[in-house]
Amino acid sequence: MPDQPLAVELRARRSEMMLETLEAVALRLFEQRGFSAVTVDEIAMEAHTSTRTFYRYFPAKDDVLQVMIERRSEALRVELAASPDDEPPLASLKRALGSVLSAEDPGAVRRWISVIQATPSVLRSVVGGITLKSQPVMGEFFGSRLGLPGDALVPTMLAAAAGGVIMTAHTQWFLLGGDLADTVTSSLEVLERGFGTHTGVWTEVAEGPA
């Protein structure tokens, strides 16, 4: 059936569009009325779909806040995989994040942060999502440059340090404005100065003290 690949592609695109619609509607309602005050039924109604469809995409209401983390993590993985082998690791991370963040809608990111800031009950799950999804992507990349498994101590530490800088930069951007990609990449320069940009420095980090 020659039309089957096209049909599969169309179904995948429709599914992606529904996910994006549900996420956008939910974030708007969460910001306007508060996370706890919004029901799944209301999100589905605003998105012109059914509650059953909502649960097909999200096991629970707070899983809507994980979509951005998952989307970013996959985009970051792709960008880092395309990094030149001779590019310093933190330079690669800055470039990759700059590309990923520049492609996002700043308004949607601001709504996402606004909801999280206003809802302490979801903060733990969001931080957990970042720890479980985004940081391992960075850890695998750092590990590949250091000749270590991604879950080894040094790559994990570096990923956690970078993750902390990135989250802090998001908060600063939310409070002070400006360009998110520029704020994040500028903040990562603190780590870059601390760990150096040359491969030799990273080799010493991986090998530990003599």
Where does each model-flagged region fall?
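N-terminal intrinsically disordered/low-complexity leader segments
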Residues: 1-17, 192-210
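Short amphipathic alpha-helical segment with a characteristic S/N-K-E followed by hydrophobic residues
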Residues: 37, 60-65, 75-76
